[in-house]
Regions:
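Non-transmembrane alpha-helical segments in soluble domains
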Residues: 2-9, 52, 56-59, 63, ...
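Active-site His/acidic residue clusters
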Residues: 2-46, 82-84, 88-92
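Metal-dependent active-site segment of extracytoplasmic phospho-/sulfohydrolases and closely related
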Residues: 14, 50-87
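Structural recognition of the beta-strand scaffold that forms the well-ordered cores
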Residues: 15-20, 49, 72-76, 93, ...
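Solvent-exposed loop/turn segments at secondary-structure junctions
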Residues: 22-26, 54, 79-82, 101, ...
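Catalytic cores of eukaryotic secretory-pathway lumenal/extracellular enzymes that build
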Residues: 23, 45, 99, 107-108
Length: 170
């Protein structure tokens, strides 16, 4: 991913990088460099340290190539917590967990960063559905006309929610 970011430096065309990690999932196998490095000395917590380093490396590459201020960074999860995993099993204020359609199974945090555009430290309980990512990103890039018109897209442009200090989700 860092090589891709470096290649895209200086280009005027908007680009998208979808960087997925397997870390922090049910089976947690952090890189050996991170085993036992977290204060909890637990594989899940060690994996979080590894993910933090990976994200930090991507952000630093954006900074070094002069692209950070022009980049929206979105970090999230694909589901709620596992009920049966220790030490944080079902550590959630919501009903149920992964594998359920209750809020605890589908409501996850979303962290967004866009220096100069999204207010740092802002918190919201507003809803942002994963299907909103495509229309929102295209809208923010000024490319809404690229949204496919030959099929139904179950998502809406949430740009105003992200950019307005007191923006409300739709």
């Amino acid at each position: 991913s860092t090589a891709f970011i470096q290649r895209m430096a200086g280009r005027e065309q908007p680009w998208l990088l979808y960087h997925c990690t397997r870390g922090a999932h049910f089976d947690n196998y952090p890189n050996e460099r991170f085993l036992g490095k977290s204060p909890a000395k637990h594989p899940y917590k060690d994996t979080l340290l590894e993910l933090d380093e990976i994200l930090g490396r991507l952000v630093e590459t954006l900074r070094q190539t002069g692209q950070l201020e022009d980049t929206l960074i979105f970090v999230s999860s694909d589901n709620g917590p596992h009920m049966e995993t220790w030490p944080d099993s079902a550590f959630t204020p919501f009903r149920c967990a992964k594998g359920s359609t209750w809020e605890g199974g589908v409501r996850v945090p979303g962290l967004l960063m866009w220096p100069g555009m999204i207010e740092a430290g802002r918190q919201s309980d507003g809803m942002f559905y994963f299907n909103d990512v495509l229309p929102t990103v295209l809208g923010l890039a000024g490319e809404s006309e690229r949204l496919p018109g030959d099929r139904y897209i179950d998502g809406i442009d949430q740009s105003s929610f992200l950019l307005a200090p007191e923006g409300l989700s739709n």
